[in-house]
Amino acid sequence: MTSATPQPGQLIVITGPSGVGKGTLLRQLRQRHPELALSVSATTRPPRPTEVAGVDYYFVSVEEFKAMIAAGQLLEWAEFAGHYYGTPRQPLVQLIAQGKTVILEIELQGARQVRQSYPQARHIFILPPSLAELEHRLRSRGQDSEEAIARRLAQAETEIAAAPEFDVQIVNDDLEKSLIALETAIFSPAP
C-alpha cells in the first residue's frame, strides 16, 4: 500500500489599503476555517501592542531584512510607510506542497511581485466603502500620527486605482457580507 501524495495547495493573495479591515476579516475567516494557513511576513516595523512575534510577523532589523533579500529568501518584498515588509519563501512553499490553502496578506507592490513569480495565485483586493470611511477607520485605530494617516490615505488612492488588476474585489462595508464574499472567492473553483 502506497501513501497518497498530498495535492498541492493554493496561494490566496489579499491586498487592500491600510485600515480597510483586512486583519479583522482574516481573523474572522480563520475562526470559521482553521484549516487555512496564514503566511507570516517579515517586517522591520515595530510590533503593535497586540501583535506576537512569529505569529503576526517576524520582526527583524533592517540589516536582517536586507540579508534575507540578498540570500533570495523572500518571495516578495517592498518598502511601505518607511518600513520593509516581505514574505519568507520557504515556509510558504512548504505549506502549499502539503496541500494547504495559504493566505498571504500583503500590499500592492508585493502582490504584483507575487503575480509575476507565482501566477497561479488567486488575488483578492479589499476596498473601503469610501475614502472618508477609510480615514475614519485609520483615525479610530489611534496608532498613527497625522503625517502617517495622510501618507496612508495618499497611498490608499494609488492602491484603490489598482483594484481592477485583481481577480476579485470586495468592498468591506459590512463585515458579515464581506466575509461571505471572501469565503466564496477562496473556496470557489478557479475560473
From Swiss-Prot:
SMART domains: GuKc. ATP binds at G16, P17, S18, G19, V20, G21, K22, G23. PROSITE patterns: GUANYLATE_KINASE_1 (PS00856), GUANYLATE_KINASE_2 (PS50052). Keywords: ATP-binding, Cytoplasm, Kinase, Nucleotide-binding, Transferase. It is an enzyme of class 2 (transferase). Its EC number is 2.7.4.8. InterPro entries: GK/Ca_channel_bsu, Guanylate_kin-like_dom, Guanylate_kinase, Guanylate_kinase_CS, P-loop_NTPase. SUPFAM superfamilies: P-loop containing nucleoside triphosphate hydrolases. It catalyses: GMP + ATP = GDP + ADP. Residues 9-187 form the Guanylate kinase-like domain. It is found in: Cytoplasm. CDD domains: GMPK. Its main location: cytoplasm. GO terms for cellular component: cytosol. It comes from the Bacteria. It holds the Pfam family Guanylate_kin. One of its GO terms (molecular function) is ATP binding. Belongs to the guanylate kinase family. HAMAP family: Guanylate_kinase (MF_00328). Essential for recycling GMP and indirectly, cGMP. This is Guanylate kinase. It comes from Thermosynechococcus vestitus (strain NIES-2133 / IAM M-273 / BP-1).
